[in-house]
């Protein structure tokens, strides 16, 4: 079990304590860490909508350290990132794999970055299903539709051809921060502020 640090802030009304993530949210920083799943996606969507309502003209920063996860949960975050008015700055800290890499690339063009030792990995969606042959066929068709959608969006955000994306996501494709920049997943590698 991890302990979340508390931050004490002095105000004209006295002291106020926040958990570190709430304090950073005041600075328009959202942490996307761990597996992308429904509960996490709902929290991130809520934070995005809250920050938009606070000031639709100021950028929102999403720090990503994720091994990936659920496509539908990730698409809820992605669609909200594209829907709201503020620009979204994405920054890979540690790793952005699978859906994490997709969300990293989905930031506002020119505002996507990675730290020097970050790792990025893209691949095709994973799926598994058991049951009747007709149900397996339905799920296989759905995974192919999802694969096409993800590849289309990656091509849009990276500037790579759909053919290149299909080839490069056929198997796990790991990249350094510099390689992710050359590929178009991020716009810069940040060394210092």
UniProtKB/Swiss-Prot annotation:
One of its GO terms (biological process) is protein quality control for misfolded or incompletely synthesized proteins. The active site is at 98 (nucleophile), 123. The keyword Hydrolase applies. It is found in: Cytoplasm. It is an enzyme of class 3 (hydrolase). SUPFAM superfamilies: ClpP/crotonase. Its EC number is 3.4.21.92. Coiled coil: none annotated. GO terms for cellular component: cytoplasm; endopeptidase Clp complex. GO terms for molecular function: ATP-dependent peptidase activity; ATPase binding; serine-type endopeptidase activity. It catalyses: Hydrolysis of proteins to small peptides in the presence of ATP and magnesium. alpha-casein is the usual test substrate. In the absence of ATP, only oligopeptides shorter than five residues are hydrolyzed (such as succinyl-Leu-Tyr-|-NHMec, and Leu-Tyr-Leu-|-Tyr-Trp, in which cleavage of the -Tyr-|-Leu- and -Tyr-|-Trp bonds also occurs). InterPro entries: ClpP, ClpP/crotonase-like_dom_sf, ClpP/TepA, ClpP_His_AS, ClpP_Ser_AS. PROSITE patterns: CLP_PROTEASE_HIS, CLP_PROTEASE_SER. Keywords: Cytoplasm, Hydrolase, Protease, Serine protease. Pfam families: CLP_protease. Belongs to the peptidase S14 family. Fourteen ClpP subunits assemble into 2 heptameric rings which stack back to back to give a disk-like structure with a central cavity, resembling the structure of eukaryotic proteasomes. Cleaves peptides in various proteins in a process that requires ATP hydrolysis. Has a chymotrypsin-like activity. Plays a major role in the degradation of misfolded proteins. This is ATP-dependent Clp protease proteolytic subunit. It comes from Haemophilus influenzae (strain PittEE).
